[in-house]
A protein has these predicted regions:
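Conserved SAM-binding strand-loop segment of SAM-dependent methyltransferases
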Residues: 78-89
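Conserved SAM-binding loop
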Residues: 71-72
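A short glycine-rich, Lys/Arg-flanked "PGG" loop and its adjoining helix->strand segment in the class I
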Residues: 116-128
Length: 130
């Protein structure tokens, strides 16, 4: 049985999970203007789209093809620069160190035996002052 959000992602005009989270919005004043941000398990992009709209460099990935297709549609429509991938966190093609990595509502869906490996990868991908 597929998760409910797979069908929700097909509606390209409505955010599946609403506005960006309060926690992500609160981090914005602490970011450099040229901050590099990674959104892990980005869903339909509520955080990636918001942050790219503020001018940050954003990479985002999710397992869901529907989610990434929705982000790609919205980034084109709004002329935003977001690099997207359809992949698992363990298969992400690491590009560079990030100032901020968002993992919002994702860890609980990762196999518990793989969570320590994922945490180590996230630490490795984060800048020293990130």
């Amino acid at each position: 049985m597929k998760p409910f959000w797979e069908d929700e992602y097909l509606n390209k005009e409505k955010s599946t999970f609403g506005n960006p989270s309060k926690e992500v919005k609160e981090l914005v004043p602490y970011l450099k203007k040229d901050a590099k941000i990674l959104d892990v398990g980005c869903g339909d992009g509520r955080h990636a789209l918001y942050l790219a709209g503020l001018g940050f460099q954003v990479d985002a990935f999710d397992l869901s093809k529907n989610a990434i297709e929705k982000i790609d549609y919205l980034k084109q429509k709004n002329n935003l620069n977001i690099h997207t991938w359809i992949c698992d966190v363990l298969d992400y093609p690491f590009r560079y160190s990030y100032d901020l990595i968002i993992v919002h509502g994702v860890l609980q869906f990762i196999d518990k035996t793989k969570q320590p490996q994922v945490i180590e990868l996230l630490k490795k991908w984060t800048n020293v002052n990130g």
